[in-house]
Each structure stands twice: as structure tokens, then as C-alpha cells.
A protein has these predicted regions:
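Substrate-binding cleft of secreted/luminal carbohydrate-active enzymes
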Residues: 47, 138, 246, 250-314
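Active-site groove signature of glycoside hydrolases
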Residues: 128-157, 179-187, 217-219, 282-290
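Aromatic-lined carbohydrate-recognition surfaces of secreted/lumenal glycan-active proteins
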Residues: 164-195, 212, 242-255, 280-289
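Aromatic-lined substrate-binding rim segments of carbohydrate-active enzymes
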Residues: 62-133, 151-181, 226-229, 237-240
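Aromatic- and acid-rich polysaccharide-binding/catalytic face
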Residues: 102, 106-108, 145, 182, ...
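Boundary/entry segment of secreted carbohydrate-active catalytic domains
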Residues: 34-84, 287
Length: 314
């Protein structure tokens, strides 16, 4: 017969074993969560918001971000921009939490980091490592960010195009969704127009098989110039006839500098844009979404984005 102490110790061991099994099962379930299949038909919109590392300097918590996403009228696509100086594994908790309430677009290489890549292989490895760590929580992969930017991207456009093509081929081989983000600007601000750059440097197979081409544009960087978006997307449709098109970044270049009212007006402008061409699918991906919208309960920008989305759903 077991003594009372032996019975207690045995019960403790059984309890510990049960708790360990529960933890491993839950952890494995989360890690092996099936990848969402957004694969929307051509006429289905993306409603995007962006999270970059700058939010981490605020007092906002991941749970507050999740709560704000859950309060949106649709399941959004959250674009998570990753910094090269941050370990890929460090993003896993954020990706996991966001993917439970939204589609996720990973941006492993922001345009601001492009000069840190000295060869195509190092750029592709960034995507290989990111895919290995985060693919279970990622629905879209941005293979090139502001791909045609001059100056801050470096002075070798063919090299930039080759890096994006390398990342595209890798992600495409995994049968995952590929996204290319181009950069629009006021007339004569760069040597080569966005459209001409894309025609010249993007390989033909990539033009045909990309899933999305989205356009980044900031009025703050372009003297408040307002593009003729109908013409822009007509031109893009001619270059990428089989690809879904939309806006890949918008908002302000400094969230502290501009008034709430100006942000509200800009948010309404973008999130209520019409369907310019057959393959237009929205996007938008407001850059400082966390800083402008979280906590969401009293955020006028959050309300403006949501009300505009609701209008397009009618």
C-alpha cells in the first residue's frame, strides 16, 4: 500500500504529465495551423492595413491590435513589414496572433533595407528563411517593395529587379501568393516612369504569373500631387492583364506631423476608391495603422477607414 506522501507525489506527476501533453498539443496545433487560402476571385476586394516595427515603440499591446482588427467590418489583410535587423523568429508571435483574426501579408524586405542586400542570393535567402519560419501564418508574400524607387533603393535597377525575381520564383515554387509593390510619384520626379520601369525590368513570366501588383503612393512625398488613378490602372492592366491590381501603401510619411482631420480625409479618399479596372481589388494598407487606430475605441481614423469599407460593401 502506498503511503499518503507517495500518493500525493504520484498524483503530482500525473498532473504534470497531463499539463505537458495539453501544452504540446495546443502548441503543435498553433504551429501547424493550416494556411488560409484567400485566393479571392478577381472581383473580390482586399481591405488592407499595415503594421511595421515602429508600433513597438508605443505602449500598444498585441492584444489591443487584435481587438481592433476584430472590430473591423470585414476580415482584413494585415501587411506585416519586417526589419532586416530583427530576427525572423521574433516575428512569429505577432504573425500567429494576427493570423487568427486576419489574412496576413509578409513583407520580409522593406525598400528602406534594400541597400543592405549585396547579392541576389542573400535576398532570396531572406525569403527562404522567412517562409520556413512563418509560412503557416502567411497568406501573401510581398516579393518586392517599392521596386522601382530611385535613390534609396540603390543605383542598379537591374539588380533590384533580379532580387525580386529571385524571391518571386522561390515563393511561386511553393504555390504561395506573390505580391509586387511598385512606387508611384509626381511627374518627372524620377528618370523612368513607374510603368516604363515595370515594362523594362520585370521578366515576362513574372508579368504573367504574379498574383498581385499594388502601388505605393504618398502625397506627402509628392507635394500633394493627385494621380489620375484611372489612367494609372489602365496602364497597369495593359502590362499585367492577368494580375490583380490595387493600392499597396497609403497614409502619411510621419504620423505625428499631420492632423487627425487630414488623416480622416485621406483614409476616406483611399478606402472608398472605385473599381478602376476589372482586376482592381482595393488594398490600401494604411501605413501607420497601429499608431493612428489603436486603441480603436476613440480613433477617428479607425472610424473613417471602417465607414469607407462599409460603403464599398453595399
Amino acid at each position: 500500500m502506498l503511503s499518503q506522501n507517495e500518493i500525493i507525489n504520484k498524483m503530482k506527476r500525473i498532473l504534470f504529465l497531463c499539463m505537458t501533453i495539453i501544452f504540446i498539443t495546443c502548441h503543435k496545433s498553433n504551429d501547424e495551423a493550416p494556411q488560409s487560402n484567400p485566393n479571392p476571385p478577381t472581383n473580390t476586394y482586399l481591405y488592407g492595413i499595415t503594421i511595421d516595427d515602429s508600433w513597438d515603440k508605443t505602449r500598444v499591446t498585441v492584444q489591443q491590435i487584435v481587438n481592433a482588427i476584430k472590430a473591423m467590418p470585414i476580415k482584413p489583410t494585415v501587411r506585416i513589414v519586417m526589419s532586416k535587423g530583427t530576427a525572423i523568429a521574433d516575428y512569429k508571435p505577432l504573425f500567429l496572433a494576427i493570423h487568427q483574426v486576419a489574412y496576413v501579408m509578409a513583407t520580409p524586405a522593406d525598400s528602406e533595407d534594400m541597400k543592405k542586400y549585396t547579392n541576389v542570393d542573400s535576398y532570396v535567402k531572406r525569403f527562404q528563411d522567412s517562409y520556413e519560419e512563418l509560412s503557416a501564418y502567411t497568406d501573401f508574400w510581398e516579393v518586392g517593395n517599392e521596386i522601382n524607387g530611385e535613390g534609396w533603393m540603390g543605383d542598379n535597377p537591374q539588380f533590384i529587379a533580379d532580387t525580386a525575381y529571385g524571391a518571386y520564383k522561390f515563393i511561386h515554387s511553393k504555390k504561395a501568393k506573390t505580391v509586387l509593390v511598385s512606387y508611384y510619384f509626381k511627374p518627372d520626379d524620377q528618370k523612368v516612369t513607374m510603368e516604363d520601369w515595370l515594362k523594362k525590368y520585370i521578366p515576362e513570366d513574372m508579368k504573367k504569373q504574379l498574383d498581385y501588383v499594388l502601388v505605393s503612393y504618398y502625397e506627402d512625398d509628392n507635394d500633394d500631387y493627385q494621380p489620375n488613378w484611372q489612367n494609372v490602372f489602365n496602364n497597369l492592366e495593359a502590362i499585367f492583364p492577368n494580375v490583380k491590381l490595387g493600392i499597396g501603401e497609403c497614409g502619411n510619411n510621419d504620423y505625428k506631423k499631420y492632423s487627425v482631420q487630414s488623416k480622416v480625409q485621406r483614409a476616406k479618399h483611399y478606402y472608398s476608391m472605385p473599381k478602376y479596372v476589372k482586376n482592381y481589388v482595393g488594398g490600401y494598407f494604411w501605413w501607420y495603422w497601429v499608431q493612428d487606430c489603436v486603441p480603436h475605441q476613440n480613433s477617428e481614423v479607425f472610424k473613417a477607414i471602417n465607414s469607407s469599407i462599409k460603403q464599398t460593401l453595399k
